[in-house]
Amino acid sequence: MKFSEPLVEGRLIRRYKRFLADVQLPDGTEVTAHCPNTGSMLGCQPENARVWLSRSDNPKRKLQYTWELVETEPGVLACVNTVRPNAQARAAIEAGVVQSLAGYAQCRAEVRYGSEKSRIDLLLSGHDHDPDAWVEVKNVTLAEGGEGYFPDAVTERGQKHLRELMAQVQNGDRAVLFFVVNHTGIEQVRPADHIDARYGQLLREACEAGVEVIAYRAALAGEDGDPSGRLELVEEVPVSLEP
């Protein structure tokens, strides 16, 4: 799984209005890129950081560029495009990378479910032995000393998803919280109790109720270190629920 076209490198000037980022290209040109991330992006927007943009030739688009990657510190990459994780997770599942979710015949996206009117990211069905698996995907980019934390801001929506997953377990199905680790410096994932204590509490309750929690890290760079290379998930990362 790769970017469809080579990315364009630049330097971050600023992010503003949540969805916009000004970037200076190598020739000195300044462009405004779409920032497809509604979170705080804590730790992922250092001043003058190296960033990589995808480019669209669609004349109907208001902004030609989309912010994809950032170098959070020398040699460490993060993918800030929150549109990517669902496709990354699905590709890994269908390729057999995620052993705990292997053997399902069908994968559907954005299926309506639950009493709180949610949409599940991925619904796996058609397994010979296991019940259907409801998979909620979350992007992890907040890193502190090798630890990855989720969420990076208080998330009532994320809390709702945990309640919905617990309900699916009660209904007799599998429910899975899938952390896509889009940061090459993260070695372990844990709940960000210091940011959203309620989310951490609910996550632990969900695990006790039977919700499965897994995490896989993306490559983000090719074998030659080219940051416009690989998006595929390549390695499972441990999850710790200790406070």
Curated annotation (Swiss-Prot):
Q: Check the record and name the CDD domains matching this protein.
A: SfsA-like_bacterial
List the Gene Ontology MF annotations in alphabetical order. DNA binding
Gene3D superfamilies annotated for this entry? Answer: 2.40.50.580, 3.40.1350.60
Q: Which residues form the signal peptide?
A: none
| Pfam families reported for this sequence | SfsA, SfsA_N
Q: Which family does it belong to?
A: Belongs to the SfsA family.
Q: Please identify the protein, giving its name as recorded.
A: Sugar fermentation stimulation protein homolog
Tell me which species this is from.
Answer: Marinobacter nauticus (strain ATCC 700491 / DSM 11845 / VT8) (Marinobacter aquaeolei)
